[in-house]
């Protein structure tokens, strides 16, 4: 439950911070459209996470892999946003992450991908054989390398690549 509530609350806080910082993008929109409710849209992540957890508990297909992004992975993506913003290592990226439209997009994509019917490979290794777990091992090595180079910025990139590698792998297996 924590991995669903905390990301929604964090997105709420991120939207509120944008309102308080009075960015020009936000106030330009405020002139034409009331934006006071926008922070509450962050809780769509919480609702989508609740739905995913309820669905996961009764779905028998998810024994060896996941269908849709697991809530802890989604929580990592959302929680990496403030870590990137406050690290000051990537000033341009920090500015981009203060854009309310980008945060709305992230909220929508996050809520969707939690419940999308996309099979994602599992990192659970039951019996270690290189042939069977080559993709998972290479993915973990690449993730560690990315994190060592980029720090917090690597977190959303790793999760996005996790989804993309899974989609590509599924398409390749479907053709075979």
Residue ranges of model-derived segments:
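Homeobox/homeodomain signature
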Residues: 43-46, 56-59, 105-110
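Contiguous mid-protein beta-loop-alpha structural module that forms a pocket-lining wall or clamp
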Residues: 52-58, 63-65
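C-terminal membrane-associated helical module and adjoining short loops/tails
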Residues: 63-176
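Multi-pass membrane catalytic core of lipid/isoprenoid biosynthesis enzymes
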Residues: 1-54
